[in-house]
Amino acid sequence: MEHPAYTLSLLTTAGGLMGYYRKGSIPSLVSGLVFGSVYGIAGYLLHMNRDGGLEMALGASTLLLGAGVIRGMPSRFTKPVPVVLTALGGLGSYYYYNKYKEFYP
């Protein structure tokens, strides 16, 4: 269950770094590093069977989904970055919501 969190950690960190190197965007760098760190911590907690990992991954995925939708609406999802953010957030939210329902019926 921790593999999606580690994957999302890598992808969000790489996306933040790419946004910084291509456009010099400090907000992209900060958000990529923050989301990457949160997903990394969630993955670690899930791997160690500690409390809070599932909720942390679900919360980060929901925020990522919201950020993608908010960024995509003005451009009607014609730009690739909001589409990727929305897709990653949606997939993460779907996965971790189903896992949450599985463990806490």
Swiss-Prot record:
GO terms for cellular component: membrane; mitochondrion. The chain crosses the membrane at residues 26-46, 53-73, 77-97. Signal peptide: none annotated. The keyword Iron does not apply. Keywords: Membrane, Mitochondrion, Transmembrane, Transmembrane helix. InterPro entries: TMEM14, TMEM14_sf. Belongs to the TMEM14 family. Present with 2100 molecules/cell in log phase SD medium. This is TMEM14 protein homolog YJR085C.
